[in-house]
């Protein structure tokens, strides 16, 4: 098993005694798509800042594909690509200049840099904008430019800090497709996001930071299994009779939409049986968004209660 990122007792105390990180231990395997979640002020940004050498740790150890970030910083940083939350490129350079110059910082030859720039700008639908100054791009295009720039030295580990913040739904889903494909081809990805649907759609494993501590580190599948219940939305055939369900919490959203809470031990089959017996046809069914968000809130509240 190859470890892409390892944090050992990572701590950060800011002036004034504010403890941002309280000893985080974490291993992310090579090839993983890992979500790092937590409320504002939990320590996510500090963790990302330390990994990317933008914030000095107080103590602990960080290694990237076995390279110690303190003792072998050059090799460690060659393995790592960062897409920060804030735009930090020269707005007066062209799109292609920005990504080609970034490759040069890592020793990529000029000819190869131009080859890579075409590859990534095309994949991210920016090739047609390659000669435009970055300041002329829309917010979504700037986000994609940040991803292209981070990939120019072809890192093994890509860290994305809120990569789809402010991006419309259609573009967000397009970026998800690109990131899934990148991960399928072998790039390890760590994602921080406030869009919990994004984490559920993309990530196989998840860590939750709260008050500078890693309070959860598990697979997405195992985390979702902790849900005590799920809420389903059922679309009913028009002019259906008024439904009545025994043993379930439910409500009619409108005359043709039924919302049902199903405990894990109950299952959904009895709902369909009861509705069928009443002559009610179910046209479609979906989960009420967002399952992960419900669980995230309950876990954070649970940990806050433990600290009280």
UniProtKB/Swiss-Prot annotation:
GO CC annotations on file: plasma membrane
Domain ABC transporter residues, every copy: 5-236
Biotechnology: Has been used to construct a 2,4,6-trinitrotoluene (TNT) biosensor strain.
Induction: Transcription is increased specifically in response to 2,4,6-trinitrotoluene (TNT) and its indicator compounds 1,3-DNB, 2,4-DNT, and 2,6-DNT.
Binding of ATP, residues: 38-45
Keyword Transport carried by entry: yes
Sorted UniProt keywords: ATP-binding, Nucleotide-binding, Transport
Similarity comment: Belongs to the ABC transporter superfamily.
Protein name: Uncharacterized ABC transporter ATP-binding protein YadG
């Amino acid at each position: 098993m190859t470890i892409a990122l390892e944090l050992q007792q990572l701590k950060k105390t800011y002036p004034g005694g504010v403890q941002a990180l309280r000893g985080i231990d974490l291993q992310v395997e090579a090839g993983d798509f890992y979500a790092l979640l937590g409320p504002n002020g939990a320590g996510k940004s500090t963790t990302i800042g330390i990994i990317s050498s933008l914030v000095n740790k107080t103590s602990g150890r960080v290694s990237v594909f076995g390279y110690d970030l303190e003792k072998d910083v050059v090799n460690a940083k060659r393995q790592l690509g960062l897409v920060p939350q804030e735009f930090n490129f020269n707005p007066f350079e062209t799109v292609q200049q920005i990504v080609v110059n970034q490759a040069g910082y890592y020793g990529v030859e000029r000819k190869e840099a131009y080859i890579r720039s075409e590859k990534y700008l095309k994949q991210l639908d920016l090739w047609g904008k390659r000669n435009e100054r970055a300041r002329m791009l829309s917010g979504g295009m700037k986000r994609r430019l940040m991803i292209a720039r981070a990939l120019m030295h072809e890192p093994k580990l890509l860290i994305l800090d809120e990569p789809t913040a402010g991006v419309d739904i259609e573009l967000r889903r397009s970026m998800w497709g690109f990131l899934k494909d990148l991960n399928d081809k072998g790039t390890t990805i760590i994602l921080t996001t406030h869009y919990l649907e994004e984490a559920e759609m993309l990530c196989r494993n998840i860590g939750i930071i709260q008050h500078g501590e890693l309070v959860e580190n598990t697979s997405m599948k195992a985390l979702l299994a902790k849900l005590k219940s799920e809420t389903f939305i059922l679309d009913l055939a028009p002019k259906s009779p008024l439904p009545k369900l025994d043993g379930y919490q439910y409500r009619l959203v409108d005359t043709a939409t039924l919302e049902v809470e199903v405990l894990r031990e109950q299952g959904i089959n009895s709902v369909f049986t009861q509705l069928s017996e009443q002559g009610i046809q179910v046209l479609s069914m979906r989960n009420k968004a967002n399952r992960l968000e419900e669980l995230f809130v309950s876990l954070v509240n649970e940990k806050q209660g433990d600290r009280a």
